[in-house]
Amino acid sequence: MSHTITGAEPKETNTFFGHPRMLANLFTVEMWERFSFYGMQGIMIYYLYYTADKGGLGLDKDMATGVIGAYGAVVYLMTILGGILGDRLLGPERTLFYSAIGIMAGHISLSLIPGVPGVVIGLLLVAIGSGGLKSNASVLVGSLYSDNDPRRDAGFTIFYIGINTGALLGPILTGWGWSFGGFHLGFGLAAVGMAAGLIQYALTRNNLPASVHHVGTPFTGAQKRNFALALIGVVVIIGILLGTGLMTADNLKNWVMGFIFIGAIALFVQMLTAKDVTSDERSRVTAFIPLWIANAVFWALYQQQFTVMAVYSDERLNWNILGMELSPNLINSINPIFIVIFGAMFSALWTKWGDRQPVTTLKFSAALIIIGLAFWIFLTQAGVQSVNVGWIVLILFVCTIAELIISPVGISLATKLAPKAHRVNMMALYFTSVAMGTVLSGWLAPFYSMETEVPYFTWMGIITIATGVLLFLVHKPVQKMMRGVK
């Protein structure tokens, strides 16, 4: 998906920390979107597997973690659809606006519609909306600055702070709502947050640069028809699978994993065999194969903070702090704190090192080894009846360090390795690796229990560290295949 729209020159009058005034608007809408997204996701798993007397649906715990993993994967797949809509059909601004409406509608469904129907409708709307908003928000931020504006990087840093502020506050407030009024009050607070962001955005959206209100490379009539038929075909196929009972909540993660795998293979084959791809570009696409696998392995562990770690937080952690019994979903507020604190530090570090910084393959390798070691920290608390919250803080701190090493370079690498005629496909390929890791976080969860935590965390560390070491051993030939890309 193209993020090349830059828009008009910024106005001289700056009213938001020396930046264009509309940055405050985009900061706020993204903050509220992340507030609602992480706030809802933080309590959703408990809503799924808690028994009815606790306000939940009473699903099997393994089924619940599988649904969460599949849902998270679909969100990343929807970023591909959102990018296409923004680039080719609606334009980035309208795509973001309609996506925000969809997110709000999803949270309202979760708060008002009881039972499984509310979950299905709500999660589907939130997944589609989040994908559209996630893939177009940065385009709108970029449109506020010219390409050579020295404030550009600082503007994205401020925007990034907004994202993590929302991710920090969301679980805190929805957890409070859950504690005092049940799950549906928590979902309702997520809906209110998204509504607040949507209202303030709608009032000033026309002040954005003209470029984001237009379609950069519109579909031709035939392309538009084929796109519509493809979407209808996907909906029909999924409807048939659901109607015949072949796709159920219990095996949803397997279907999603299969779709992602087939899609990734198709994208690789398409780019490797295309006639408009040069030999250098083909070599770069081939070099992305081991990095695609490494990226999927990394996110398979990292995203377990919404599956395995959420269950661990509920069953193993002592959330009684200073005499107050806190909600287990607060585990999801820990990572954003570290990102805000250390994100700018890592950015400055890479800038200072310049050409002396490690090549991308070594960064991937280091991130895998570090997150594998983070999972081994769980072993120190094996057999402890009530684990101190400080241990999960330490584990997530180490996970965040790994994320800050690998996450920023992932998208950048995909854009640098992409064939000129297939940039959208390469970005789609990158997001399939994140989606694969996310669905794996749900697929792996049934192997975890209080009784199996030692072998589980041991093997998670072994597999991930081994993958990192293997990537380190082959990093020179992989870098050579990148043909000059670092």
Predicted region positions:
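Glycine-rich segments within core transmembrane alpha-helices of 12-TM secondary carriers
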Residues: 151-171, 178, 186, 191-197, ...
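Conserved MFS/SLC helix-loop-helix module at the cytosolic interface between two early adjacent transmembrane helices
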Residues: 79-113
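Central cavity-lining transmembrane alpha-helices of secondary-active solute carriers
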Residues: 65-86, 333-346
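C-terminal ends and interior cores of transmembrane alpha-helices
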Residues: 101-119, 366-385
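Hydrophobic core of transmembrane alpha-helices in multi-pass small-molecule transporters
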Residues: 106, 117-133, 386-405
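Short amphipathic helix-loop junctions that connect adjacent transmembrane helices
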Residues: 42-65, 305-329
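Intracellular loop-helix junctions on the cytosolic face of multi-pass helical membrane proteins
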Residues: 1-19, 147, 175-306, 310, ...
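Cytoplasmic membrane-interface "Motif A"-like loop-to-helix N-cap segments
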Residues: 88-100, 352-369
